[in-house]
Design a protein with these regions (language model features):
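Conserved active-site segments centered on acidic
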Residues: 1-70, 135
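Short beta-strand scaffold positions
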Residues: 2, 76-77
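Phosphate-binding/catalytic loops
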Residues: 73, 79-137
Length: 137
């Protein structure tokens, strides 16, 4: 399970990339304050499509306790998200980690409503982080 704020930029991008890099896994995503039922942001979709990943078939969804319980691993973009999930779902604290853990605990900032350059940087960070995680499975 991959988490960000709105589930329209970072987490769906990471979901699509990690699923492509580790097809043996069941990868999903959700948002802490999701833009429920919205598609992936057009700038995030453009980055995915440009780099050969699918941006299709995404509908943002809200994180809830059931999703957390069902997940074997929960990857977040920023430390504050990790703290929040550990506070809100204390039983899951052992399985909540940064997506950027293997990149010196890199935090991946939210590109929402920012430039295409910001989306390109975030895409690069997410792709590198997903590659690092895929090598662990």
């Amino acid at each position: 399970m991959i988490i960000c704020i709105g589930n329209i930029c970072r987490s769906p991008s990471a979901e699509k990339i990690l699923q492509a890099k580790a097809p043996q896994l069941k990868v999903s995503s959700a948002g802490i304050s999701a833009h429920v039922d919205k598609p992936i942001d057009k700038n995030a979709a453009q980055q995915l499509d440009t780099h050969g990943y699918s941006s299709q078939n995404h509908s943002a969804r809200q994180l809830d306790e059931q999703l957390i319980q069902e997940a074997d691993l929960v990857l977040v973009m920023e430390e504050f998200q990790q703290r929040r999930l550990m506070r809100d779902y204390p039983a899951s604290s052992g399985k909540v980690m940064l997506l950027g853990k293997w990149l010196n605990n890199l935090e991946i900032n939210d590109p929402y409503r920012k430039s295409s350059e910001a989306f390109a940087l975030v895409f690069q960070q997410i792709e590198q982080a997903c590659q690092a995680w895929s090598e662990k499975f």
